[in-house]
Amino acid sequence: MRLVILIASLLVLTEPSNSSALDQPGSSCDDLGALAADPLRQSEPVRFEDIQAKRLISACRTDIESATKAQDQARYYLQLGRGQLRDDDTGGAMASFNKSASFAYPAGYFAFGVAYLLGDDVGKDDTKAKVYLLLALKGNVVWAAKALSALHQNRASEFYDAKLAQNYLTLFQDSQF
């Protein structure tokens, strides 16, 4: 459950959005589930609480099957994972986030890195979390800096470093890459 809450907070509270899935005119995976933290998103972001899980899951599965570009498939898998998470299918969400990350998709790395950071539905692994979050940050996923700050703030982590935690937090707050 902690995984759902933190992933939801990191995948939801990214930036304010005036859009909601109910306002979206389209029925595509992008229109129904775009993540604000995704620098490669193709539509206005949809807040997590506004996701219509069943519609999003169906649209993403359809779009995955018809996608011809790997980047599009990766984005659709990320958004499919959001729908599955909204539908309380954490196992399905993890598989979708993993698939997105397997395409080297920056926001997919972010989602998977957060999962390893928390360690609820996958074994907690700070090393893997750091690797995935750094890959996400390299791909300009601003929210990865905040997750890295949390990792380095944790006194129980082998990566505890208060100064580095503050640097990542400042990077996140400044949103300068």
Task: Describe each region flagged by the PLM.
Residues 25, 149-177:
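Terminal, low-structured helical/coil segments at or just beyond the last alpha-helical repeat
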Residues 50-54, 68-70, 86-91, 102, ...:
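Short coil/turn and helix-start
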Residues 78-84, 111-118, 147-155:
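Hydrophobic face of amphipathic alpha-helices that form TPR/SEL1-like repeat modules
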